[in-house]
């Protein structure tokens, strides 16, 4: 089974949207196997967003993601990455369809409420930044 990482960003947590967003992912048939809340520091943000380090928005991204608490979750399921990315919508909420997380809940391109892994390979790396294997729970979903 494929795994993927979901982060509810500070704007989502501050508006009390973590539960709604997690519920939307479970309704897709994805199984929640890891969950935690944390305050991301600059070191973790730098590791997580390393692929964007050379981009002009990197500093603002790190400032934003470290500005408040986040919810980190790992979901598992068939085509988990693709299902979650489709449910999240386009990066820019203004370009996201209604019915997607960002289309319904996102504020702007920076405060777009969620992050999701963009590939199964990247998901493995991202998950390892936030969770040890022993923190991920294997169970039969009924």
Swiss-Prot record:
One GO location term (cellular component): cytoplasm
Stored SMART domains: NDK
Active site positions, chain numbering: 115
Top-level division of the source organism's lineage: Bacteria
One biological process term in Gene Ontology: GTP biosynthetic process
Residues annotated for ATP binding in this entry: 9, 57, 85, 91, 102, 112
Protein name, UniProt field: Nucleoside diphosphate kinase
Gene name of this polypeptide: ndk
């Amino acid at each position: 089974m494929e795994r993927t990482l979901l982060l509810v960003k500070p704007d989502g947590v501050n508006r009390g949207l973590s539960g709604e967003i997690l519920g939307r992912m479970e309704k897709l048939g994805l199984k929640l196997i890891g969950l935690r809340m944390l305050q991301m520091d600059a070191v973790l943000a730098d590791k997580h967003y390393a692929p964007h380090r050379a981009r002009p928005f990197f500093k603002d991204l790190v400032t934003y993601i470290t500005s408040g608490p986040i919810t980190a979750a790992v979901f598992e399921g068939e085509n988990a990455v693709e299902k979650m990315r489709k449910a999240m919508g386009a990066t820019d909420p203004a370009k996201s369809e209604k019915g997607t997380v960002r289309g319904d809940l996102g504020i702007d391109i920076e405060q777009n409420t969620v992050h999701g892994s963009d590939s199964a390979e990247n998901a493995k790396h991202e998950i390892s930044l936030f969770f040890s294997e022993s923190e991920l729970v294997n169970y039969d979903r009924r």
